[in-house]
A protein has these predicted regions:
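Intrinsically disordered, low-complexity, charged/polar segments
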Residues: 53-74
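Short beta-strand-centered aromatic/proline hotspots
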Residues: 35-44
Length: 74
């Protein structure tokens, strides 16, 4: 993990949910009970690389909401 950068995870309306450090891991829980762990890398205030894919944090939140996937720090 690098120099103290934190990724502020929000919902699709930009409400803060939690933060994870650069290199931190989130747990995604699917509706069928399966879970998945993803590494998060800080890009800038509004963007992160999650499981190797670059997202605007709000876009990621919208996709998770649309697919009914909950997520939290691991």
């Amino acid at each position: 993990m690098s120099g103290g950068q934190k990724i502020c995870m929000t919902d699709s309306k930009s409400r803060t949910l939690f933060s994870v450090p650069d290199g931190g891991i989130i747990r995604m829980l699917y509706g069928n009970g399966e879970d998945y762990f993803a590494v998060c890398r800080y890009l800038d205030e509004a963007h992160a690389e999650i499981d190797g894919v670059r997202y605007a944090v709000r876009e990621f939140a919208g996709r998770m909401e649309q697919n009914r996937i909950s997520y939290a720090p691991a």
